[in-house]
């Protein structure tokens, strides 16, 4: 809805466009009834009515959180609103808080004063090592259990081991196996919830010769020295 179909739903952390390294994971389908069942099995209770349900924990506390989003990105603000509406159907109250980018970055990168954040992650190249700054437990860009002197969990320690192993491995298949295990761990633990991979599109005049857009940045000008305009 918010991206006009110009995106691919994600089942894992890596875009399926990264065909060399992305692991094909089972799709996560929208299933409201299954979500309700899982919440009830976990001990939550639903109060209110069908039009305005209220989800509460076993102690009677209302399930609610604030979702911060950079106000400069209208698409992400719209996505946050869709998330808010979807979770309301389960009785979960979400307060969407659009923030100026500087304040958004301060909270997500410095003070960590937020419940949940809607952000984007991009890498400069498809190689697995380019994801290390976000996945490695000691990285300043690591969003869950931040600023770790050592891994807080066994599964994060395992990811650290796998990232180090694939970085020193010269065999492509063994590198792929290690990075696939990283993706399986992330899909199981779900420290971040993947939503979509946005599509990139470029438009150029037919008069431009040698235009060959790339999937990597800079998408349109990587071969700038070869581009020229064919005069009529």
Where are these regions (language model features)?
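Solvent-exposed loop/turn segments at secondary-structure junctions
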Residues: 5-9, 18-21, 71-75, 101-103, ...
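Sec-exported extracytoplasmic/periplasmic mature domains
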Residues: 3-7, 15, 19, 37-45, ...
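Append "and occasionally in soluble cytosolic enzymes with long acidic Gly/Pro-rich linkers
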Residues: 1-85, 161, 181
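Periplasmic binding protein-like
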Residues: 88-142
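Bilobed periplasmic-binding protein-like "clamshell/Venus-flytrap" ligand-binding domains
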Residues: 44-70, 117-120, 167-206
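Conserved structured core elements
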Residues: 4, 8, 29, 33, ...
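Structural recognition of the beta-strand scaffold that forms the well-ordered cores
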Residues: 1, 11-13, 65-68, 95-98, ...
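Short, solvent-exposed loop/beta-turn-alpha elements that line the ligand-binding surface or hinge
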Residues: 20-34, 49-63, 108-113, 133-164, ...
